[in-house]
């Protein structure tokens, strides 16, 4: 769930997240128990409980990590000069985050009802704010509506294309390059 520039986690917490996402994808969130997660990990339920008190805590942890990657991207991008090279790098990092976190996004899509009961609305509002910030970084906060729409189209289409083609593409790097090219073409430096 981390792209280049962020620190990957190889600890128990990350392993729990990975296994939980696998089981949620296989069985659904509602049909997966903490016991099953612990069994797949090869640990006791008590050991799992030490890290996470509930499935909801696990979900919050991996969604928070995913959204934190976007926060880091926006914070970094705000410190950069507004150039074509920066714009391309911002889009490349964004595409990397989307590709790295595709399992999280799939979970969110497949388990909407469960997510709605988890008080996740604040997290999604925060994520929408980060997307607004990303658009500001790409075209400027005072850009005309046409430029902002082009930037949002580029960002949203890039994310959707990554998720749609990831399992269909033979070459993940080629997919990333194509999506980056498409997104970059949608946002000229001056509109």
PLM regions and their residue ranges:
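Amphipathic alpha-helical packing segments from all-alpha helical-bundle domains
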Residues: 71, 116-152, 177
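Short, basic, alpha-helical segments at the C-terminal edge of helix-turn-helix-like DNA-binding modules
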Residues: 64-71
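Short, hydrophobic secondary-structure boundary micro-motifs
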Residues: 106-109, 117
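Hydrophobic alpha-helical segments that form the core
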Residues: 144-166, 172-186
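N-terminal intrinsically disordered/low-complexity leader segments
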Residues: 1-11, 164, 168, 191
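Hydrophobic alpha-helical connector segments
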Residues: 61, 74-106
